[in-house]
């Protein structure tokens, strides 16, 4: 289930807002210049579906987003719990960073947690299957895929070489309990890291 939780950066243990309503999530994110949509499931895809099969299944939505946003390249990526570099990849994306182009993702399967550092607040969005999010260039954020990552996502790029520049900055973090990342079966709970003031 998709969940948006909003915290003050200095009081992560006291959520100001928490909602699972897709329309409310979209409205709250739109107030901050972000876009969120729920796309209808087109077909049931196998866990080992190829990037070509995934792109074909969502061709209508992909074409619409490419046209609206001027995106040139779209690809599909998957990460599973047995990936040998999952711990290193998780640590890399837990560092707060910005991109020189929009970060646009659609979750075909599984889930992941985007934490968006907007002013003195953090918007923690647990994205699940059929969620689409567009994070504007220059937005401070980090991504937690959990200790046992399971997701497949479409990625949209303005740059045909998919080389959007990332700037990573380490920030102090405080661990706060958060919803468990799972893929339909029970998974171990993970700890959501929220940025605190430097």
UniProtKB/Swiss-Prot annotation:
> Where Ni(2+) is bound, by residue?
97, 99, 103, 141
Q: Kindly state which keywords UniProt assigns to this record, in alphabetical order.
A: Amino-acid biosynthesis, Dioxygenase, Iron, Metal-binding, Methionine biosynthesis, Nickel, Oxidoreductase
Marked site, Important to generate the dianion, at 105
Return the annotated site residues (May play a role in metal incorporation in vivo). 96
What does UniProt give as the signal peptide span? none
The answer, when asked if Iron is one of the entry's keywords, is yes
Question: Which positions does the site annotation May play a role in transmitting local conformational changes cover?
Answer: 102
Tell me the InterPro entries matching this sequence.
ARD, ARD_bac, RmlC-like_jellyroll, RmlC_Cupin_sf
The molecular function terms in GO held by this entry are: acireductone dioxygenase (Ni2+-requiring) activity; acireductone dioxygenase [iron(II)-requiring] activity; iron ion binding; nickel cation binding
UniProt xrefs under CDD domains: cupin_ARD
> Which Gene3D superfamilies does the record cross-reference, listed alphabetically?
Jelly Rolls
Q: Which top-rank group of organisms is this from?
A: Bacteria
Query: Which Pfam families does this chain map to?
Result: ARD
Q: What Gene Ontology terms for biological process does this UniProt record contain?
A: L-methionine salvage from methylthioadenosine; L-methionine salvage from S-adenosylmethionine
Reported EC number(s) for this entry are: 1.13.11.54, 1.13.11.53
Q: Which reaction does it catalyse?
A: 1,2-dihydroxy-5-(methylsulfanyl)pent-1-en-3-one + O2 = 3-(methylsulfanyl)propanoate + CO + formate + 2 H(+); 1,2-dihydroxy-5-(methylsulfanyl)pent-1-en-3-one + O2 = 4-methylsulfanyl-2-oxobutanoate + formate + 2 H(+)
Task: Please give the pathway this protein is involved in.
Answer: Amino-acid biosynthesis; L-methionine biosynthesis via salvage pathway; L-methionine from S-methyl-5-thio-alpha-D-ribose 1-phosphate: step 5/6
Q: Which residues bind Fe(2+)?
A: 97, 99, 103, 141
- What cofactor(s) does the depicted protein rely on? Fe(2+); Ni(2+)
Q: What does this protein do?
A: Catalyzes 2 different reactions between oxygen and the acireductone 1,2-dihydroxy-3-keto-5-methylthiopentene (DHK-MTPene) depending upon the metal bound in the active site. Fe-containing acireductone dioxygenase (Fe-ARD) produces formate and 2-keto-4-methylthiobutyrate (KMTB), the alpha-ketoacid precursor of methionine in the methionine recycle pathway. Ni-containing acireductone dioxygenase (Ni-ARD) produces methylthiopropionate, carbon monoxide and formate, and does not lie on the methionine recycle pathway.
What the record says about family reads: Belongs to the acireductone dioxygenase (ARD) family.
Instruction: Fill in the subunit field for this protein.
Output: Monomer.
What's the protein name?
Acireductone dioxygenase
Q: Which organism is it from?
A: Synechococcus elongatus (strain ATCC 33912 / PCC 7942 / FACHB-805)
Query: Which gene is annotated as encoding this protein in its UniProt record?
Result: mtnD
């Amino acid at each position: 289930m998709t969940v948006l939780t909003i915290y003050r950066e200095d009081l992560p243990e006291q959520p100001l807002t928490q909602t699972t309503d897709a329309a409310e999530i979209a409205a709250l994110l739109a107030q901050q210049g972000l876009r969120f949509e729920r796309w209808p499931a087109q077909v049931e895809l196998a866990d080992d579906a190829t990037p070509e099969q995934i792109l074909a299944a969502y061709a209508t939505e992909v074409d619409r987003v490419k046209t609206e946003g001027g995106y040139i390249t779209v690809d599909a990526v998957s990460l599973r719990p047995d990936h040998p570099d999952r711990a290193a990849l998780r640590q890399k994306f837990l560092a707060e960073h910005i991109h020189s182009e929009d970060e646009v993702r659609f979750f075909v399967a599984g889930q992941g947690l985007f934490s968006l550092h907007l002013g003195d607040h953090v918007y923690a969005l647990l994205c699940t299957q059929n969620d689409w999010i567009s994070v504007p260039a220059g937005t401070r954020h980090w991504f937690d895929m959990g200790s046992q990552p399971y997701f497949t996502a479409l990625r949209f790029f303005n740059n045909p070489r998919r080389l959007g520049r990332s700037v990573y900055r380490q920030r102090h973090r405080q661990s706060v309990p958060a919803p468990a990342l799972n893929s339909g079966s029970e998974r171990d709970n993970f700890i959501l890291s929220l940025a605190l003031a430097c």
